[in-house]
């Protein structure tokens, strides 16, 4: 109750698998800036501040700490998923692929209108929310900018949590 007194709001929502982390917030707060995080990481103390500072610099972009870069075949088609991404997103590019484990800040309306279409994402991409989110932001044309973080692995500390209980 103490956190609720400070402004924390807890809402129950439908379980839509891994999409539950972001989609209900997008539906209920369509004009909000939203930060996505995982519950099995200890984050640096300035984690939110750095994301928000980047957002304030240019509110049209998605900012993230950790991600990949999408690779393509010579004919321009994307490589299969397991070959398609390499860790090492850099700079600002539409082909940067943020990974949610280390935090992402989404500006309002940075995604295609189908982003929250439950029937569509559960049919086309039921187990890969990160792929769905990336495609929806690419369709909108939103750039993704990597926030360089020296000593990343020592700042973002994973907790050893059983996946079935989280």
Language model regions located:
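C-terminal catalytic/acceptor-binding lobe
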Residues: 113, 118-166
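A short, glycine-/small-residue-rich helix N-cap motif at loop->alpha-helix starts
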Residues: 13-21
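Active-site nucleotide-sugar/metal-binding loop of Leloir-type enzymes
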Residues: 22-33
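Short, high-confidence coil segments that cap the C-terminus of an alpha-helix
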Residues: 31, 58-61, 142
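Short beta-strand-to-loop acidic/aromatic patch adjacent to the donor-nucleotide binding site
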Residues: 31-42
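Acidic donor-binding segment of Leloir-type glycosyltransferases
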Residues: 1-12
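Conserved catalytic core of nucleotide-sugar-dependent glycosyltransferases
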Residues: 25, 42-120
